[in-house]
């Protein structure tokens, strides 16, 4: 698994604060690609920009260009900074890529340019949109004596563990699957996205909601124990390179959308409302 590589990136970002004052920008800017699963087709590209002092830049960018390093073809994309929660966030862009290989992300702000390289695979590492993902065997509340044996959430919501994935995709309801580890999340976004899901699910009784813990042996572990943690079988079966991830499946079990990292309550609501139309 690639969790350790991205753990370093997220930990680094989480230490620093966002800055709204970009008037004193120097020549040194660092672009950090946060999203990890890029493939031919539709993608969401998440990235952060840090100044020389490690502060996150949040202002509107003058230009954002993605260049294919194989063909030199360039794509001008739109992006804006998305605030996750107080002091943290990232730039988010939607882009459609027609070739695998290495790409260059080039940004410009206040006449200062910076860039980063990212890889695009022929096929997504995680389940493909428009297809049925592999069947998962997941634990549910009725099979354990204590919910805290299957989730690191300090205040677990029983309704997120009442049904297994196998049963969920058979009951003709849309299904939302969140992979996160609230107590051991290096990005600091697992808890907030889980809380967002708890807050909005009460208005969507016609959906299945599942939370799947990322690690098998999370009990009594801390972030100092990352090297000893073992990911769960569902994480392996769906090929997750990072955490958290959230997946939206229609009432036939077909994947309609997926998101890596944090998404807001409004984004969750938007995706749920789209599923209602299928």
Question: What do the PLM-derived regions correspond to, one by one?
Answer:
Residues 187-203:
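Typically the conserved alpha-helix immediately C-terminal to a functionally engaged Cys/Sec
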Residues 211-243, 247-255, 271-275:
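Thioredoxin-like thiol-disulfide oxidoreductase module
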């Amino acid at each position: 698994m690639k969790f350790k590589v991205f753990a370093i990136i997220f930990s680094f970002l989480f230490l620093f604060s966002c800055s709204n004052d970009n008037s004193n920008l120097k020549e040194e800017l660092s672009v950090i690609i946060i999203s990890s699963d890029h493939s031919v087709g539709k993608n969401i590209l998440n990235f952060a920009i840090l100044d020389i002092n490690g502060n996150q830049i949040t202002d509107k960018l003058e230009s954002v260009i993605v260049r294919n390093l194989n063909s030199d073809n360039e794509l001008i994309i739109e992006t804006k900074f998305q605030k996750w929660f107080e002091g943290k966030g990232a730039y988010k862009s939607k882009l459609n890529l027609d070739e695998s290989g290495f790409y260059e992300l080039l940004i410009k702000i206040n006449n200062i340019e910076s860039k980063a390289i990212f890889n695009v695979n022929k096929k997504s590492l995680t389940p493909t949109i428009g297809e049925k993902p592999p069947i998962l065997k997941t634990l549910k509340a009725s099979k354990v004596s204590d919910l805290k044996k299957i989730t690191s959430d300090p205040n677990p919501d029983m309704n997120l563990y009442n049904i297994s994935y196998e049963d969920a995709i058979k009951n003709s309801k849309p299904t939302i699957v969140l992979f996160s580890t609230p107590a051991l999340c290096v990005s600091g976004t697992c808890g907030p996205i889980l809380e967002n899901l708890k807050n909005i699910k009460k208005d969507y009784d016609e959906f299945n909601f599942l939370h799947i813990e990322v690690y098998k042996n999370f009990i009594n572990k801390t972030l100092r124990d990352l090297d000893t943690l073992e990911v769960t079988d569902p994480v392996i079966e769906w090929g997750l390179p990072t955490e958290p991830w959230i997946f939206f499946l229609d009432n036939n079990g077909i994947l309609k959308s997926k998101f890596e990292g944090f998404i807001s309550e409004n984004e969750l609501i938007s995706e749920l409302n789209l599923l209602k139309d299928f």
